[in-house]
């Protein structure tokens, strides 16, 4: 018992360090995504770092959000956005994609093609499954909205496979992980075409 009492402070410190590491991992995963968060935690990232990757780019956007925002309280509109993102970004995460950023009422995500990971076919299949899942989730959310007498939400999803620069950009004090390149622009353009379909 005396021996345990002597090592207790060291064991307590180890437990605190492990708890802090777990907290850091959870925060980085939540704010940066799993892949980017792991790189930051291990010190592999500095501003301007990037690599060319092949990935399915996912871009989704909520329709008519400005009139919605103008007709609702801030709290209600933020709740609506969270419900919407839970459906769309939640589907991305549940199918092992990585959400890179939320841009107002839009989201950008990737399904990367990697050695030892997904092939192009597998990345495309995962992205399409996520899109179908998102459609089902939004259909359920819209059924709930209609049962409360509110209009259904419109949205679009654009998917495109291509090469992009994946890395971080920003200032010395604030950086952000993103993808840049023609494939990312194409995904956004494809999503925009959903408005007329």
Predicted feature residues:
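Regulatory cytosolic signal-relay segments
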Residues: 2-52
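Cytochrome P450 core scaffold surrounding the K-helix E-X-X-R motif
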Residues: 168-171
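Cytosolic regulatory/linker segments at or just downstream of nucleotide-handling modules
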Residues: 164, 193-197
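Catalytic NTP-binding/metal-coordinating core of nucleotidyl cyclase/transferase enzymes
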Residues: 44-129, 177
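Short, charged, low-complexity patches
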Residues: 4-8, 74, 127, 183
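Alpha-helical scaffold within the catalytic cores of cyclic-nucleotide enzymes
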Residues: 82-97, 113, 117-157, 182-193
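A structural signal for short, well-ordered beta-strand segments
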Residues: 57, 107, 155-161
């Amino acid at each position: 018992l005396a021996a345990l009492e002597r090592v207790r402070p060291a064991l307590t410190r180890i437990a605190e360090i492990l708890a802090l590491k777990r907290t850091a991992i959870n925060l980085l995963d939540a704010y940066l995504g799993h892949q980017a968060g792991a790189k930051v935690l291990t010190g592999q990232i500095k501003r301007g770092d990037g690599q060319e990757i092949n990935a399915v780019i996912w871009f989704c956007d909520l329709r008519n959000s400005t009139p919605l925002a103008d007709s609702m309280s801030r709290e209600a509109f933020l709740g609506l956005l969270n419900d919407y993102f839970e459906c769309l970004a939640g589907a991305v995460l549940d199918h092992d994609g990585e959400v890179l950023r939320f841009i107002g009422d839009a989201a950008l995500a990737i399904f990367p093609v990697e050695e030892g990971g997904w092939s192009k076919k597998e990345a495309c299949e995962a992205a399409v499954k996520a899109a179908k899942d998102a459609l089902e989730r939004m259909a359920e959310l819209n059924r709930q909205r209609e049962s409360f007498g509110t209009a259904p939400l419109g949205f679009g999803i654009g998917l495109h496979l291509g090469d992009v620069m994946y890395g971080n950009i920003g200032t010395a004090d604030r950086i952000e992980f993103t993808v840049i390149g023609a494939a990312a622009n194409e995904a956004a353009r494809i999503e925009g075409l959903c408005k007329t379909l």
